[in-house]
């Protein structure tokens, strides 16, 4: 970072809303955040204790639940603070750096993980007899590690390009968390090259992952159409539709915010709610809690807790 950086703290403008809605929004987002954390913790616990769920699909789901729990934690608590009092809008320079890094780290890792999960479902549906050998434990670990390392590299690029510039004047960020586009608008230097590199970097990651996901689901649909029973096709299509809704809730807002021409405006904070608040809450429901195997495991865990002496 530049030694010319004089700004020691930033002020977050928060989520755009009418002044009288502070208490209502605080209550809503607090409940959503608590449900998100508890839902993802439950998924992690259930998959951990039930050996029947120790499969590649649930291995990736544990990674997703872990990411979602912390992805929401990176932004939502600070957003709640901005709704409580004006002093809650302040964030130190170094805290802002950390928030931006972990936001992009977890967000891009989730992006890569969606791609891996769609590939896993493609193999499971298209090659059911060879699936176990094709998705061995070592291969699952390698794919998961690759998503985390790729996310870390992507985030490092975003953070370095954003904060190596000098910040010596305005310090009001038009957002409810620290993100690259609104922060770059405050830099005391030409940001055109930085904006272009960030645009290309995010564009390659987002569009590349989305194209691979679409190709995987097109192949899955082709495989589903070859299923002879109408009930089997219906259930498979319902599962794919649910997964696609979550993917769209994550990718479409990202495209709107990061890959559109023009500068960021205040309403982008509202759009960002979809992937910072809504998607982490939906994932436990769509990917696991609607699954019969997980429901059965949850009931078994409940019985163990309620009747610990039963065998």
From Swiss-Prot:
Residues 1-23, 74-98, 160-196, 258-268 are extracellular. It comes from the Eukaryota. GO terms for biological process: detection of chemical stimulus involved in sensory perception of smell. Pfam families: 7tm_4. Disulfide bonds join 96-188. Glycans are attached at residue 3. The keyword Transmembrane applies. GO terms for molecular function: G protein-coupled receptor activity; olfactory receptor activity. It is found in: Cell membrane. Its main location: membrane. The chain crosses the membrane at residues 24-44, 53-73, 99-119, 139-159, 197-216, 237-257, 269-289. It is a multi-pass membrane protein. Residues 45-52, 120-138, 217-236, 290-311 are cytoplasmic. PROSITE patterns: G_PROTEIN_RECEP_F1_2. The keyword Manganese does not apply. One of its GO terms (cellular component) is plasma membrane. Keywords: Cell membrane, Disulfide bond, G-protein coupled receptor, Glycoprotein, Membrane, Olfaction, Receptor, Sensory transduction, Transducer, Transmembrane, Transmembrane helix. Odorant receptor. PANTHER family: OLFACTORY RECEPTOR. This is Olfactory receptor 10G4.
């Amino acid at each position: 970072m530049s030694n010319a950086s004089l700004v020691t703290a930033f002020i977050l403008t928060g989520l755009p809303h009418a002044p009288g809605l502070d208490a209502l929004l605080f209550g809503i987002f607090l409940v959503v955040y608590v449900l998100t954390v508890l839902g993802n913790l439950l998924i992690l616990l259930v998959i951990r204790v039930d050996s029947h769920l120790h499969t590649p699909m649930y291995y990736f789901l544990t990674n997703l639940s872990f990411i979602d729990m912390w992805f929401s934690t990176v932004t939502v608590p600070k957003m709640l603070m901005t709704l409580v009092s004006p002093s809650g809008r302040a964030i130190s320079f170094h805290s802002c750096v950390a928030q931006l890094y972990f936001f992009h780290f977890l967000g891009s890792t989730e992006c890569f993980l969606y791609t891996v999960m769609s590939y896993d479902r493609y193999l499971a549906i298209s090659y059911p007899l060879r699936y176990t050998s094709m998705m061995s434990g070592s291969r699952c670990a390698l794919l998961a590690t690759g998503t985390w390392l790729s996310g870390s590299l992507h985030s490092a690029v975003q953070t370095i390009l954003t904060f190596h510039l000098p910040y010596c004047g305005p310090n009001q960020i038009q957002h409810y968390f620290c993100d690259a586009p609104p922060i770059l608008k405050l830099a005391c230097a030409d940001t055109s090259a930085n904006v272009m590199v960030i645009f290309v970097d995010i564009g390659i990651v987002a569009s590349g992952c989305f194209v691979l996901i679409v190709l995987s689901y097109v192949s899955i649909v082709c495989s589903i159409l070859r299923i002879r029973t109408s009930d089997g096709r219906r259930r498979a299509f319902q599962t794919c539709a649910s997964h696609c809704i979550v993917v769209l809730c994550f990718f479409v807002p990202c495209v709107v915010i990061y890959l559109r021409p023009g500068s960021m405006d205040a309403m982008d904070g509202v759009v960002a709610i979809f992937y910072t608040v809504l998607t982490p809450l939906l994932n436990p429901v769509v990917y696991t809690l609607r699954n019969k195997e997980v429901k059965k495991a949850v009931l078994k865990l409940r019985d163990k807790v309620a009747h610990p002496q039963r065998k």
